[in-house]
Structures are given as C-alpha cells and as structure tokens.
Swiss-Prot record:
GO terms for biological process: tRNA methylation; tRNA wobble uridine modification. Belongs to the MnmG family. Transmembrane segments: none annotated. It comes from Ehrlichia chaffeensis (strain ATCC CRL-10679 / Arkansas). This is tRNA uridine 5-carboxymethylaminomethyl modification enzyme MnmG. Homodimer. Heterotetramer of two MnmE and two MnmG subunits. The lineage of its organism: Bacteria, Pseudomonadati, Pseudomonadota, Alphaproteobacteria, Rickettsiales.
Length: 625
C-alpha cells in the first residue's frame, strides 16, 4: 500500500497550489485528479486577476506559488485596472490563452519535485479515533486503491455532488462533460460536516467567425504589460484585443419573456449564486431600470476560434440563448459552440475550519477553494497555498501554524472572513473588505510575504536573494531622495510645478504631491534613472502614501494587540460567567483563537469580550500557580 505525507484531491487552482506548496516544503505529496488533462483547467472565464484578486495572485507568487508565473506565460491581454485611482486599489488582470495556461500548469505539476500525480476518482476517506480525537488515515479510490496519508486536502471545486442545469435539462456533472464527486459528498455527510448548496454559471462559448467586430469598441491591453510574478521579466506572447458590445431593450425583452424557462427561476431559485457576478437573467430582473449591460468579447487564445462573452452567464435553454444573443450588436449571426449553463454543488460551512484551513472535527483534514464557499480562481489559489503550507508544516513539530492576519495579506482577510463569519453565498474578495489596504497593495506583496515564506522553506533561496537585493535598492533610493533638499525656486528652474511658498522639501516629500512622479523628479536627480523601474515605482508609491501610514500603522498596532491575545483552544466558554447562552453557543461553534477573532463574530458584545478577558487573566494565573 502507498503511503504519503500529504494527499491533495483535485487538480484545479486550489489543488495545484496546495500540492506544490506541500511538496516545496519537503512533504511527500500525492495529487489525485480525475484526469491529468484537466489539471489547471480554467473552467469559466479565461482570465486571471482583477481588483483585489490580482493582489491575491501576487501574494501567492510572493510565497513561490504557481499562478502568477503561469499566467505570465499565457497572457494575451494584460492591464492594470483602476490605474487612474490610487495604487491601493490597482488590480492587475490578464486575459489568458486558455490552452497555453493549462499546458503550462500541467508541465509544472507533472514534473514537480516531491509530487506524484495519480489519475483516479476518490470515493471515500477513513479516519482513526484515539482519546475522542479523530485523525485522517486513508483515501479510497473508485477502483478500491487504499492510500495511507498523514494529511488530506480536499479541493473539489464545483464537483462535490455537482449538477449542471440548462433550462429544464439537468445532469450530474462538476463541469461540462465531467462526472461529479458523489462518494466524497456522502463521506462528509457521514462525518457530520454542515453542508450547503451554492451555484455559479458560465456563458455560452461563441464562434469567432460568426461575429461582426466592425463597429464594436476595441479593448486593448496596456502598451507595456506588467507581469504578475516577481520572477518574470516580461510578457512574451503577442497581445491581442478584446471587444466591447452591450445588451439592449430587445435583449431584455427576450429574457423577460423567457424567465420562467431559466433554471435560475425554477430548480435553482432557492440556491444562492454569486452576488457580484450575476447571470444576465438576474441582471435584467434586479436592475429593471437599466436598458443595457456591457458584454466583453474575450478571445480564448491566440489560435482559438472561441470567444468568451463576459457578462452574460445564463441558465436559459439553448433556443433562448440564441434568440437573446442575436439581438446584441455584432452577434446578429452568431453560432454557439457550447451552451451556457449553471452548476450547483455542495460546500461546507467554513466556520468549521481553523485559520490554517484544517477542520475542527478531524485532525489532518483540510479544505480549500470553492468547497469553502468562495468563487474565483484567485480566491481558490490563495486558500490552496495556505492549506498546502500548513499541512506540510504540521508534519514537523518545530513549526508553528502559518496564519496570515488581516494586516498581512488579502489572503488573510479572506480566510478570516470565512472562518469567523462564514458565508451563505459565493464569497468574492474586494478591496473594501480589507481594513489596511494602504499596506496591502499589489505592488508590495513580495515585501510583505516572501521573507515569511522563506522562514518556513516554502520560498526558494533564489527568490529570497532577489527580494533582499530589491529591499536594499529601495532603502538606498529612499535615503537618496530624503537627503536631497530643494526649494520652490530651484524646482521652478526645472519646470516642476510647486507652490512658491518658500518651504524647503526633500525630493521624497515632493513625490507625495499630486502630479509629481519619478519622471519629473529625475530632472533634478539623475540618480533615479540608475535604479530598476519597479524599485523606483515602489519608492514613489511609498512616498505618496507616507502621510497616511502613521494612522494606518496605529490601527494595525491596536489590531495586533487583540490578535496576539490568544484564547486557548481547549477553553470551555460555558464556564465564563456573564455570557449569554446564545453567545456561548457561537463561541463554542467557531472556537476563536484570539480576542480579535472573537470580537469579529457577529453578535459578540463588548461586554462579552470584557468577560472573556477577565476569564483569561484568571485562567493564566491559575495555570502558572
């Protein structure tokens, strides 16, 4: 019988990151997937990144993850969203060549050190019990292979008892043409995990040769594409355009007349879909005052004849999809290559997890990705890398759990939201979810996380050396700019617009002014041109935000004081005087490990926090006496 340190079930975005992270740390790792040909599949839109999401990809990359490097190899239309706004809300995004992305990911995974890949369907897993504690023991495949493992990570995506819907038609599937995971769903029920149902959707795929692009608005990427990975030097594939069209009143009339035929109005009406990525039927129903909704026509590859119409996910029958599409400019003669559909699937209540993504019920069992109620490739990758890291670290008692706080990363914000608040609808990250977004930017993920990753052996020495050199360059350039003092008169000689108030300023302070950038500063400081472009941009961003950092850092300090006030995992909240039954039940269910985490649980009052703090002082004194 085979024995592994870590077994990962599922080869999607969460599974690939989980397996690779565990293997990097040195764990003997097995990735089990239905088919190696679907590893790294982009099930829905052929794009990576976006607002908040792009920052997560950079954070995964900063921990030596795969997604950033792979999308840089597959990018065919790259841009920074929100570029006109502040850097704290910039969103790197790249349209991918779907085939190149998948092939690149497969090539990495199938040749990764310490990682074995097995084609099989997992139907069950077993646990052992000792002293009323349950621990993962084996994984059982459909052909009755028994595989022993110390740690198990489930990254089942939409496959957990998945069902696809197109109008009144439905069939068991986790993705179009692929069988769902039924056995594992029954296993989780058997072990009393709290399961719910969610759904998501995808639009029809269109034949590029049947679309009239003349008259549509061209959407080019950035003239100088920015890589996602801190290890990538450039984007090498040719960059091609997307096109923008829109629905109209005729489109909406077709949809309204056929709402009763959409699965979302019938069999799926009580199952929550992504709030911020609604189907076209839901858009028409919820925003009845609008006469138009944007549709982005996105190529699926350099040599692909498939167009992904971003903005019109649907669960309507095929004939309605045709009727609807033919009312949209450019799509009057469109041919559908594959129907749009909705898929419903099981997810677990993420409040049953620790911040490590290990389950509270069963030791050694981890969940990552859509099984935790999230939506999006990037959210899945962020959870996958954390689950893989913690599964591998837990094999060695010298390591503490690797937990990213809300002040560390968007990944930390997401996981804290999930395990503390739970979710009743597909969870998506936004910059507005992060309290400390001035510090959690897409440009500085490596400065925030790479050293932490190196300390636990998930980051290579090569990447860490690059980080150290970059840090030193940032310090050097910052000091140079802080030590050059100028006057308004001197600046005027260089045609640099600044108030003639007689105030002497350092060049670093000057960068904090609106409309002053490194290109302007280089007129009076040629040394700037000697530094790497990314380093110069990093220093400029820090200068822009410098006046605001003191307040944000004070907020972070107060936050960390509560985060570092730990609550023992074995505490009995029923023994704390002054807590209502309702509050005791919430605390027992979620089992917060810090005062900060307890405070974020809905319904936990300031008085309850005070009572817990009093009890903790008593608990600590009793333990030391």
């Amino acid at each position: 019988m085979d024995h592994y340190d870590v077994v990962v079930i599922g080869g999607g975005h969460a599974g690939c990151e989980a397996a690779a992270a565990a293997a990097r740390i040195g764990a003997k790792t097995l990735l089990i997937t239905h088919s190696t040909s679907t590893i790294g599949e982009m099930s829905c839109n052929p794009a990576i990144g976006g607002i908040a999401k792009g920052t997560v990809v950079r954070e995964v990359d900063a921990l030596d993850g795969l997604m950033g490097k792979v999308i840089d190899k597959a990018s065919i239309n790259s841009s920074i969203l929100n570029r006109s706004k502040g850097p704290a809300v910039w969103g790197p995004r790249a349209q991918a060549d779907r085939k190149i992305y998948k092939n690149t990911m497969q090539d990495i995974i199938l040749n990764y050190p310490n990682l074995t890949v097995l084609e099989a369907s997992v139907e069950d897993f077993t646990i052992t019990e000792k002293d009323e504690k349950f621990t993962v023991e084996t994984v059982i495949t459909s052909d009755q292979q028994v595989i022993y493992t110390k740690k198990l990570i489930l990254t089942t995506g939409t496959f957990l008892q998945g069902t696809i819907h197109i109008g009144s038609y439905n069939t068991p599937a986790g993705r179009f043409g692929e069988q769902p995971s039924i056995g594992l769903a029954k296993t989780l029920e058997k072990y009393n995990f709290k399961l719910g149902r969610l759904r998501t959707g995808t639009p029809p795929r269109l034949d590029i040769n049947s679309i009239n692009f003349s008259g549509l608005q061209e959407q080019k990427g950035d003239s100088e594409p920015s890589p996602f990975s801190y290890m990538s030097q450039s984007i090498d594939l040719p960059q091609i355009s997307c096109y923008l069209t829109a629905t109209n009143t005729r489109t909406h009339e077709v949809i309204k007349n056929n709402l009763h035929r959409a699965a979302a109005s019938n069999s799926l009406k009580d199952i929550k879909a992504p709030r911020y990525c609604p189907s076209i039927e839901e858009k028409v129903r919820r925003f009845s005052e609008r006469n138009s909704h944007q549709v982005f026509l996105e190529p699926e590859g350099l040599d692909s004849n498939i167009i992904y119409p971003n903005g019109i996910t649907t669960s309507s029958p095929l004939d309605v999809q045709y009727e609807m599409l033919k009312t949209i400019p450019g799509l009057e003669k469109v041919n559908i290559i594959r129907s749009g559909y909705s898929v419903e699937y099981n997810f677990i209540d993420p409040r049953e997890l620790y911040h490590t993504l290990e389950t509270k019920k069963i030791s050694g069992l981890y969940f990552a990705g859509q099984i935790n109620g999230t939506t999006g490739y990037e959210e899945a990758a962020g959870q996958g890398i954390i689950a893989g890291i913690n599964a591998a670290l837990s094999l060695n008692s010298k390591y503490e759990p690797f937990i990213l706080k809300r002040s560390d990363a968007y990944i930390g914000v997401m996981i804290d939201d999930l395990v503390t608040l739970g979710t009743s609808e597909p969870y998506r990250l936004f910059t507005s979810r992060a309290e400390y977004r001035l510090r959690l930017r897409s440009d500085n993920a490596d400065l925030r996380l790479t050293e932490l990753g190196y300390q636990i052996s998930v980051v290579s020495s090569k990447r860490y050396t690059i980080l150290k050199n970059k840090k030193q360059e940032i310090i050097t350039l910052t000091n140079i700019l802080k030590n050059i003092i100028t006057t308004p008169t001197q600046l005027a000689r260089h045609n640099i617009p600044i108030s003639q108030d007689g105030v002497r300023r350092s060049i670093f302070d000057l960068l904090g002014h609106p409309n002053i950038n490194m290109e302007i500063v280089s007129r009076i400081c040629n040394t700037v041109k000697e530094f790497n472009k990314n380093v110069a941009e990093q220093v400029a961003i820090e200068a822009k935000y410098a006046p605001y950092f003191d307040r944000q850092d004070a907020d972070i300090k107060a936050f960390l004081e509560e985060e570092n006030t730990h609550i023992p995992h074995n505490i009995e909240f029923s023994q704390i005087h002054g807590l209502s039954k309702e509050i005791q039940e919430k605390l027992e269910y979620i089992k917060p490990l810090s005062i900060g985490s307890a405070r974020r649980i809905p319904g936990i009052t300031p008085a309850a926090i005070t009572n817990i703090l009093i009890y903790l002082r008593y608990y600590k004194s009793k333990k030391t006496s």
